[in-house]
Regions:
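C-terminal accessory/binding modules appended to enzymatic or scaffolding proteins
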Residues: 12-15, 398-440, 807-823
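Long, charged amphipathic helices and adjacent flexible linkers at domain junctions
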Residues: 223-228, 364-415, 422-423, 492, ...
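Glycine-rich phosphate/ribose-binding loops and adjacent secondary-structure elements
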Residues: 329-331, 431-439, 443-445, 451-457, ...
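Structural motif
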Residues: 237, 407, 424-426, 445, ...
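Nucleotide/phosphate-binding sheet-loop regions of phosphoryl- and nucleotidyl-transfer enzymes
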Residues: 1-388, 414-417, 421-424, 431-436, ...
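Conserved alpha/beta-domain cores
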Residues: 92, 517-520, 527-879
Length: 879
């Protein structure tokens, strides 16, 4: 008989895919002797069975749940649904990966009217019993039936206001009894049925809600953001309740074994007295720092420190630990690898190596490649910060700096981001419903919550700047206003600037400056460089981009797009005159001017390269992109060329194409206008000789774009070789150079063995290769690709991660056929996929020489290349 339910004692940390991350760790902690309340786990197999059976929870699975529930009754000495001594449980989702989009926790399940009275009589504490029941009704209504939580909060606020209470803890048993009646009314009005009194029915509904949450929109969005496979499913954790809301010797908290923002080796966290677990995460009350527990309960604090050390040494990673204190006794409810910033991830990984806990290889595999984005982006410019007006200070929940316009709803934040507006999402507190808005925002600001609230944890995981618990601000999400302590109101669209490292909120925009990296980052990157096989180059067209990339560890230029040099406002008139020239002499006279400009560009790049590879792609776009569209520009051009406006307009119309991206561009320009590529080749070689004569090694790579046939490349190569040889003869010097091609047309992949006869190198232009393979326009595909993801037609954006079965198969074919002709043919990638970690793993497996990407993605590519090499070496998956 297939098994779907497991006692904690039956599991281990290795069973994460079956028991979920939370369940596997509860099992592990039970087995190493930590004080974990007993319970059991419904496996991910049960979730997949539920999904496969049209969202029906089978009787066989529920019978197995009842068997384990009976065992839990024996372990606790309590009976589920028995009024005199009721067993109460918590129900939590538990996917194999931590997922903020999943169902929230339900506490105190098993309470009903009779059990609440029984609990009050048993403990002699009616207030605590009623408080637990009202919390359960709210959680059950919110989580299982999706009744908006604010409806319950409004009822609570009314009673507090009527009695002039400031805190929830001021409510007495009579107040709470009244609140329970109000909550039941809210439930019945929202659902059309009374609040369920049968505990087994409560449990069945909660299990179904967990399974349903696996496919809710929040979870789907989160999985898409983090490339998590939907087939994993989620487990359900059912655990005997312990109570943190039974007075001042009870409480609840979350602690990290190291600081999740900085990586510092110091316990970091928060706790609330007389509260239950979700109070800390929900951010409804502002908690105390964990250090304050030393004064409140020194024995518990000492035991907690021991637990932190034990768990970190057991898992050999920073842990995020959830705990409850019941009448002075510590219980551990959860441990997991703590979400952390990139700075913390790198410091912790390097420190763990230095402490002898893990190897350098393990440290490399431990840091998530995409997290490095956090380290490489701007901070506030110090000079600008001096004039900044601080309007509030909250908790520095996730480091970094951001400036943007404020929006109060996640949906509106997404819409604004799609319009290119820099967004700061402002909320009283965030919830899983806000996940997409958070992902699209530059920063998050909340009035409530602490350093371990939903906003803080999710923002750190995303690498977003976040300030939480900013109680000085009054946020009205309905009226979309932010009231400052001065009485001034800000509205949607107003600018704020946030420093997530200090918690300070500034009025207006503050200029940003480049991030500073070093120390632990450089050490980890040095370890990565020692492991990787792929070289990492940069796509750079300007000296500033190239210099920046070299600081990030680039090993040369993999793509210099010469057309970008032509768009300078001082150069574009000459480019236009060259295109519109009516004779060869007229065109060559303008090309001579452009040649000197290009020589200056190339010389500077060669000097900065200092012997590193520089791959220069010759003119690629269709000519119409350079031509004027505005009437005033056409008139200016006509005057400069001594032509009439109609003459210029007619010529522009002649050059216009119905489908320019598949038209007269790339190498096709060199077939009809060979003088253009000849000029560029001469500029490259002459500038290389200038720099060579300065004592700097130069070995330029000249790349011909859009080649479809061997004959195209052969014709252009011959023309260029003749021009280059003439320079060598004139200058009496010879320098090494290579002529190769971009492989970006499917036909070039199929005939790569022929093209390799003429090419010194292949550089895969995966952007155009993806467009031409799919027949998608990269600029327009976003209009319909979202439907493809939603309907599972495509798993992800093929312009972000290489389509291994289609585009990838063409690349593999070209690699194989190219090497049939030239065994040591140099091959690399210069499309956007060159900076994507998943694609880099694929390119490593193909044995390419290098990948090339934008400057800020160079460190990501370095780490991804090392992880790919280690994955191959040890046959382990990359992160």
């Amino acid at each position: 008989m297939r098994k779907f339910v497991y006692q904690f004692s039956e599991g281990s940390k290795e069973m994460k895919n079956l028991l979920g991350g939370k369940g596997a760790n509860l099992a592990e902690m039970t087995n190493i002797g930590l004080p974990v309340p007993p319970g059991f786990i419904i496996s991910t197999d049960a979730c997949n069975d539920y999904t496969a059976n049209n969202k029906h929870l089978s009787e066989a699975i529920f019978e197995e749940v009842k068997i384990h529930l009976a065992e839990l009754e024996k372990q606790t000495g309590k009976i589920f649904g028995f009024a005199e001594n009721p067993l109460l449980v918590s129900v939590r989702s538990g996917a194999p990966f931590s997922m903020p989009g999943m169902m929230d926790t339900v506490l105190n399940l098993g309470l009903n009217d009779q059990a609440t009275e029984g609990l009050a009589n048993l403990t002699g504490d009616a207030r605590s019993a009623y408080d637990s029941y009202r919390r359960f009704i709210q959680m059950f209504g919110d989580v299982v039936f999706e009744i908006p939580s604010y409806q319950f909060e409004q009822a609570l606020s009314r009673i507090k206001k009527a009695n002039d209470y400031r805190l929830d803890t001021e409510l007495n048993a009579t107040d709470l009894s009244e609140l329970i009646d109000a909550y039941k009314l809210i439930f019945s009005q929202a659902t059309g049925t009374d609040f369920p009194q049968a505990p087994l029915e409560q449990l069945r509904l909660a299990i179904i809600a967990v399974f349903n949450s696996w496919m809710n929109p929040r979870a789907v969005i989160y999985r898409r953001l983090h490339d998590i496979d939907a087939s994993f499913g989620t487990a359900v954790n059912i655990q005997a309740m312990v109570f943190g809301n039974t007075g001042e010797t009870s409480g609840t908290g979350i602690t990290f074994t190291r600081n999740p923002s900085t990586g510092e080796k110091k316990v970091f966290g928060e706790f609330l007295l007389n509260a239950q677990g979700e109070d800390v995460v929900a951010g409804i009350r502002t908690p105390e720092p964990i250090s304050a527990l030393q004064e409140r309960m020194p024995t518990v604090y000492k035991e907690l420190l021991y637990t932190c050390e034990l768990l970190e040494n057991h898992y050999l990673d920073m842990q995020d630990i959830e705990f409850t204190i019941e009448k002075g006794k510590l219980y551990v409810l959860q441990t997991r690898s703590g979400k952390r910033t990139a700075k913390a991830a790198i410091q912790a990984a390097v420190d763990f190596v230095q402490e002898g806990k893990i190897t350098r290889e393990e440290a490399i595999m431990r840091v998530e490649t995409k997290q490095l984005n956090q380290l490489l982006h701007p901070t506030f410019l110090e000079s600008a910060l001096k004039n900044g007006q601080v309007i509030a200070t909250g908790l520095p929940a996730s480091p970094g700096a951001a400036t943007g316009q404020i929006f109060f709803e996640a949906k509106e934040a997404v819409q604004a981001a799609e319009r290119g507006i820099p967004v700061i999402l402002v909320r009283n507190e965030t919830s899983p419903e806000d996940i997409e808005g958070m992902a699209r925002s530059n920063a998050i600001l909340t009035a409530h919550g602490g350093m371990t609230s939903h906003a803080a944890v999710v923002a750190r995981g995303m690498g977003k700047c976040c300030i939480a618990g900013c109680a000085e601000l009054i946020i009205n999400e309905h009226e979309k206003t932010l009231l400052l302590s001065t009485g001034e109101a800000l509205h949607e669209g107003d600018y704020l600037s946030l420093n997530g490292s200090t918690g300070k909120v500034y009025l207006g925009e503050i200029s940003l400056t480049e991030a500073q990296i070093g120390g632990h980052f450089n050490e980890l990157m040095a370890w990565a460089d020692a492991e990787k096989r792929l070289m990492i180059r940069v796509n750079a067209d300007t000296p500033s981009d190239f210099k920046k990339a070299l600081l990030f560890g680039a090993e040369g230029i993999g793509l210099c797009r010469t057309e970008h040099m032509f768009f300078d406002e001082k150069r574009i008139p000459y480019v236009r005159q060259m295109i519109l020239a009516e004779s060869l002499n007229e065109r060559e006279s303008v090309l001579a001017i452009l040649k000197e400009m290009q020589k200056a560009d190339f010389s500077e790049l060669f000097r900065i390269a200092d012997g590193r590879a520089v791959n220069i792609r010759l003119l690629d776009p269709p000519l119409h992109e350079f031509l004027p569209k505005m009437k005033q520009e056409i008139e200016q051009l006509a005057g400069a060329m001594n032509r009439t406006v109609p003459q210029i307009t007619n010529r522009i119309n002649e050059l216009r194409e119905a489908n320019p991206m598949l038209g007269h561009r790339g190498c096709r320009l060199a077939i009809t206008f060979p003088e253009i590529y000849r000029m560029q080749a001469e500029a490259i070689i002459e500038s290389a000789i200038i720099v060579h004569n300065e004592g700097i090694d130069v070995h330029p790579e000249i790349m011909i774009p859009l080649i479809a046939t061997k004959n195209e490349l052969s014709y252009i190569k011959k023309e260029m070789q003749q021009a280059v040889q003439a320079i060598f003869d004139r200058e009496q010097v010879v320098i090494p150079y290579d002529i190769g091609t971009m492989i970006e047309i499917p036909r070039a992949c199929v005939t790569a063995d022929e093209i390799a006869e003429e090419a010194a190198f292949f550089s895969f232009g995966t952007n155009d290769l993806t467009q031409l393979t799919y027949g998608f326009s990269r600029d327009d595909a976003t209009k319909f690709l979202a439907d493809y993801y939603e309907k599972d037609i495509l798993p992800k954006d093929p312009f972000v991660s290489i389509d291994k079965n289609g585009v990838g198969a063409l690349v593999e074919m070209a690699v194989t056929r190219g090497r049939m002709t030239s065994e040591h043919l140099k091959m690399g990638v210069c499309g956007e996929h060159g900076g994507d970690p998943e694609s880099i793993q694929f390119f490593h497996q193909l044995g390419l020489s290098y990948v090339s990407c934008s400057p800020y993605r160079v460190p990501i590519a370095r780490l991804a290349a090392a992880q790919a090499a280690l994955a191959e070496k040890h046959l382990i998956p990359t992160i």
